[in-house]
Amino acid sequence: MTKIDIAFIGGSGLYKMPQISNVKWTKIKTNFGQPSSEICTGEIGKTKVAFLPRHGKYHNISPTKINYRANIEALKKLGTENIISLSAVGSLRSDYIPGDFVLI
């Protein structure tokens, strides 16, 4: 299996990445059970990427049921050391307004 340069974990609002070419869905077993979904692998340009929909391929897993450890181990098994996790969330801080982009 080709080493993945960067992996994306999609949250609410991001269920697929049409920018990925040469798409292959791969089922990966982990020591923590099944990840949220098969993992989409392919390329964006010349970069090897993976995409994992956090809530499942059909958005059928609630936040309390997500197997986070399995998700991370599955991506690690693909050889990635770089993960970008995207989420649509709220905040109690008044200095963050809807539409702000926040890095943690």
Question: Residue ranges of each PLM-predicted region?
Answer:
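Metabolite-binding pocket within alpha/beta catalytic cores that recognizes anionic/polar moieties
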Residues: 1-104
